[in-house]
């Protein structure tokens, strides 16, 4: 049986290797060659790409999809969809899910890999049904993980539930690289023995087991696998396409792909990748810590990047040790977007504040309340009681509690566009969906769609190193430099060589934050993380009780409620919505 290959170079490869920064301008020159290979599909959209396009790159993700479809008409295009979460970080009403899928199909999407971070089939049903109703390929997903709560029967039961919902195929998604070769053989064999279904396997290379797992899965009867072109493979990413093609050549599983065509593509990305070196993670080879922490490849690079932003890069090992403990408290949930971000952010909070759950992120509270769906086992009872504050947890499908919201969202976006003088796209619904998924950054993107200066500068290849170093080397490290009101993150190597500049939080638009509370003025309320103020809730002179929410901080793509550690009166509010803050900045004081 010929094995179908899905190459993930245009989506998960760069999401895992360099924080989802690959730009459309670096995809289109090679698109025709990719289209000519004969892949089963090309993953090129979804996951974190939508967020990265509007947050960092200043690209319209809908335009990206249309351009890729135009450039690669022969090959099915594939995306990763987070079920009821779509591409955002909360559940959306069914009417939003339906319209998003419709627009994705109309813009060029063919194959939808639909997963739910909780492995709750109720959260995948609406998306899967929408995909099939619009004539696209619906692939249900088992987000693979291990824990005392997960057995072979867990995966067989979920497979059966997905088949009852209605799918065209099923993917086993090993986002952390923890699927052992023997477990892969057993899982694929047992699913194939019990069910008539096309089966696909996705593995990450982070722990060094992925190639072996793919081969054993192929022996067991898997129909297709994910790989990445060699120059965009390994470490945090995926097994190399060429290696598997060569391994299977001349066997009953021969992929039929031309190794010479693949090498030309690899050569192209070998050069392109050099431009994105500033976003690369530190991993060389494999990382056995993942066998314990179960951190997906993309999450690991993001954790490293985010800890640097918090000036806490040296705390990575502590965070990795804390992640399994947080995961257990949250019912042994799998670590895949958005739960990977939720668990990772909570672990960072626990480490940086020096006290476990001193601050509970809004999304962590959501899992404890049941707002994301069923957890594999019950969550930590004490933490749940703390966030429920006497109310009952959610036990129904979370989206059943949501009223239709598309009409209201559309009216709101059109109103804001009129007020701000924003010209919406020809298909305005695409812009509406962009803002629906990412309210603040989506609107900011629409305001600056034609203003590249509002986003990260174009990446550039690292300059050649000089033959001789300066006699007095500069101190190496990562610094934030302000140039004409804009802040940039700069890496300075030993000897003073400056590599890629990347945009930091805009400096000019942010109000200066009070550095410290004057002596005797009260107890300072400080920022536990670097980020942006989402909303200031407390008002000057307001009396608050211990535990009251004072403001909401957006950091690491999550919302963190900053609560009063004691009763008092709010004085000296030093921030407003949209302001950038650093760790330890005083936000207000409690007198």
UniProtKB/Swiss-Prot annotation:
Signal peptide: none annotated. InterPro entries: Aldolase_TIM, Biotin_BS, Biotin_lipoyl, Carboxylase_cons_dom, OadA, PCB-like, PYR_CT, Single_hybrid_motif. CDD domains: biotinyl_domain, DRE_TIM_PC_TC_5S. One of its GO terms (molecular function) is oxaloacetate decarboxylase activity. Residues 3-263 form the Pyruvate carboxyltransferase domain. Residues 518-591 form the Biotinyl-binding domain. It catalyses: oxaloacetate + 2 Na(+)(in) + H(+) = pyruvate + 2 Na(+)(out) + CO2. It comes from the Bacteria. GO terms for cellular component: cytoplasm. Keywords: Biotin, Ion transport, Sodium, Sodium transport, Translocase, Transport. The modification N6-biotinyllysine is found at residue 557. Composed of three chains (alpha, beta, and gamma). This is Oxaloacetate decarboxylase alpha chain. The gene is oadA1.
């Amino acid at each position: 049986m010929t094995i179908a290959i899905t190459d993930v170079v245009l989506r998960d490869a760069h999401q895992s290797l360099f924080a989802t920064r690959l730009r459309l301008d670096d995809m289109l020159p090679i698109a025709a060659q990719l289209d000519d290979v004969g892949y089963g599909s090309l993953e090129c959209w979804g996951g974190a790409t939508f967020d990265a396009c509007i947050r960092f790159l200043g690209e319209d993700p809908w335009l990206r999809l249309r351009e890729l479809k135009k450039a690669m008409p022969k090959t099915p295009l594939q995306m990763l969809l987070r079920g009821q979460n779509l591409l955002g970080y909360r559940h959306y009403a069914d009417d939003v899910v339906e319209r998003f899928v419709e627009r994705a199909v109309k813009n060029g999407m063919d194959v939808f890999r639909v997963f739910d971070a909780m492995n709750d089939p109720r959260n995948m049903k609406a998306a899967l049904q929408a995909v099939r109703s619009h004539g696209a390929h619906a692939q249900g997903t088992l987000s693979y993980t291990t824990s005392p709560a997960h057995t072979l029967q867990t995966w067989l039961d979920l497979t059966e539930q997905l088949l009852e919902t209605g799918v065209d195929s099923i993917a086993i998604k090993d986002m952390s690289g923890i699927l052992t070769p023997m477990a892969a053989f057993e899982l694929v064999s047992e699913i194939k023995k019990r069910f008539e279904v096309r089966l696909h396997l996705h593995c990450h290379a982070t722990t060094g087991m992925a190639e072996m797992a793919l081969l054993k899965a192929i022996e067991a009867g898997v129909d297709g696998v994910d790989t990445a072109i060699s120059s965009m493979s390994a470490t945090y990413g995926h097994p190399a396409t060429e290696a598997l093609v060569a391994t299977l050549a001349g066997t009953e599983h021969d992929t039929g792909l031309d190794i010479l065509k693949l090498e030309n593509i690899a050569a192209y990305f070998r050069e392109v990748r050099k431009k994105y070196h500033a976003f690369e993670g530190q991993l060389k080879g494999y990382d056995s810590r993942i066998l314990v922490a179960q951190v997906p490849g993309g999450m690991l690079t993001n954790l490293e990047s985010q800890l640097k932003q918090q000036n806490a890069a040296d705390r990575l090992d502590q965070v990795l040790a804390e992640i399994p403990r947080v995961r257990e408290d949250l019912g042994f949930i799998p670590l895949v977007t958005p739960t990977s971000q939720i668990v990772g952010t909570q672990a960072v909070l626990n480490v940086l504040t020096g006290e476990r759950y001193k601050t509970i992120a809004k999304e962590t509270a959501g899992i404890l309340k049941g707002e994301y769906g069923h957890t594999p086992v019950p969550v930590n009872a004490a933490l749940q009681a703390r966030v429920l504050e006497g109310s009952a947890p959610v036990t129904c499908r979370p989206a059943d509690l949501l009223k239709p919201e598309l009409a209201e969202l559309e009216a709101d976006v059109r109103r804001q566009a009129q007020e701000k003088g924003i010209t919406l796209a020809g298909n305005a619904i695409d812009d509406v969906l962009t803002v629906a998924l990412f309210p603040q950054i989506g609107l900011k993107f629409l305001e600056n769609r034609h203003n590249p200066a509002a986003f990260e500068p174009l990446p550039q290849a690292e300059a050649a190193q000089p033959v001789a170093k300066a006699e007095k080397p500069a101190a190496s490290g990562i610094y934030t430099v302000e140039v004409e009101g804009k802040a940039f993150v700069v890496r300075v190597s030993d000897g003073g060589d400056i590599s890629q500049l990347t945009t930091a939080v805009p400096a000019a638009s942010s109000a200066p934050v009070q550095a410290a509370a004057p002596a005797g003025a009260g107890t300072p309320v400080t920022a536990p993380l670097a980020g942006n103020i989402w909303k200031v809730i407390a008002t000057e002179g307001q009396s608050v009780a211990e535990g009251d929410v004072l403001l909401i901080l957006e950091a690491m793509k999550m919302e963190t409620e900053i609560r009063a550690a004691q009763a008092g009166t709010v004085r000296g509010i030093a921030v407003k919505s949209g302001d950038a803050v650093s760790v330890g900045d005083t936000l207000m004081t409690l007198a």
